[in-house]
Structures are given as structure tokens and as C-alpha cells.
Design a protein with these regions (language model features):
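Domain-length accessory/inserted modules outside core catalytic folds
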Residues: 1-115, 119-202
Length: 202
């Protein structure tokens, strides 16, 4: 068992991490984008030690080195949770998004930001030995690119709107698992089930 898998790692609280990023001066970096970007990197095969992770975050987001130890720990916790959840046999990978009590429009926007981060992180990471994505994997990336544009009306809070967003969110979660499954060796991944067509959110 690897060090990453020896203990269970949970994602940090979204709002707490958001506040830490603001304190570091990363005013435009949201936890959703950070998580999506790192998930894309890991899905493409990247692995980091603590120093390398912090350096990669600074490079990817063009920010100054973290001054706060809590911010450094939070970033490492995000990475460790991503890696552990991707490798878990129960498909327990989670998206780092605002809590469900936030307005639907904010949650939808954050989902689009997450997808944008994932695509950027995946595209920046050189794929060595992955053999390329399958047709399904390539279609999944195109679907994520469409979901980047997701939006809802500011007053959209109905049950149908909520159900639609949750359906899209679940598709994105399973899409990330599929892409990780295709780009990583069998002993470093859990087999991800095939994903279906993404639903449309109005």
C-alpha cells in the first residue's frame, strides 16, 4: 500500500479553502478550478511530491508561492484526495463544488469552471505511455468542453432545475473517472464504468 493510500483523505471545505486562496492573493482562483485543474493533471498521469505540487500550482495559475502553511496543507489535501479517490475501487471520486445550499446559478457556474480547469490540466500534462484516448474518451472531453458553458437563470431554483444540474454533475464525475481509467496503468486505477450522453441543463 502506498503512502497516499495508507489513510483516507477528504477534500477540504470549499469555503475554507476559498478564504485561504484569497488570503494568498489568488483572488481569481476558486477551489473548483484548482480541483479541476489538478484532477485533469492526475487523470493524464501526473504525480507530485509536496514541493513539486506547490510549484506546479504556482506555474499553472501564475501566482506567488503560498505564504500560509494552512494554504499549503489545503492544496496538498486536494491533490491527495484526488489521487486516492481516483484509485478507489468504489468510484468515490468527488467534485469540489459549492455546497448545495448555495444558489443554483453559482453551483452551475462552478461546475463549468471545474470542467474548464480539468480540460486545461489534462491538456497541459504530457501523455506518456497512455496510448491516447479511445473514441469514447475523446467524445467525453468534447462533452466536458460543452459543459464549460453551462449556465442557469439567476432565479432558477425549481426541482427540475436542481435535478438537471445534479445529473450533469454526476456525468462530469463519471467522465473524469473514465478518462483517468484510460490514461493510467491498471494497477494505479480503478476501472471506471462507461459514461452516457450528457444531459442538457436549461
Amino acid at each position: 500500500m502506498t503512502e497516499e493510500q495508507s489513510t483516507s483523505v477528504e477534500l477540504p471545505d470549499f469555503d475554507v479553502l476559498a478564504d485561504l486562496l484569497v488570503e494568498e492573493g489568488a483572488l481569481t482562483l476558486s477551489p473548483a478550478e484548482l480541483h479541476g485543474m489538478l484532477a485533469g493533471q492526475v487523470a493524464a498521469g501526473a504525480r507530485f511530491d509536496p514541493a513539486g505540487l506547490l510549484q506546479r500550482i504556482q506555474t499553472l495559475f501564475d501566482i506567488e508561492p503560498f505564504r500560509n502553511e494552512a494554504a499549503r496543507r489545503g492544496a496538498m489535501q486536494v491533490y491527495m484526495a484526488i489521487l486516492q479517490q481516483f484509485q478507489a475501487p468504489d468510484f468515490s471520486f468527488e467534485l469540489m463544488l459549492p455546497d448545495d445550499d448555495q444558489p443554483l446559478s453559482i453551483r452551475a457556474e462552478s461546475l463549468g469552471v471545474w470542467c474548464s480547469g480539468f480540460l486545461s490540466g489534462f491538456g497541459m500534462q504530457e501523455q506518456t505511455g497512455s496510448g491516447g484516448l479511445s473514441v469514447e474518451g475523446q467524445e467525453t472531453l468534447r462533452d466536458l468542453a460543452q459543459i464549460v458553458q453551462i449556465s442557469t437563470e439567476a432565479d432558477a431554483e425549481g426541482d427540475e432545475d436542481e435535478a438537471n444540474l445534479m445529473e450533469v454533475q454526476e456525468y462530469v464525475r463519471m467522465a473524469a473517472l473514465l478518462i483517468f481509467s484510460e490514461c493510467n496503468e491498471p494497477d494505479a486505477k480503478a476501472e471506471a464504468p462507461a459514461s452516457g450522453e450528457p444531459p442538457i441543463l436549461h
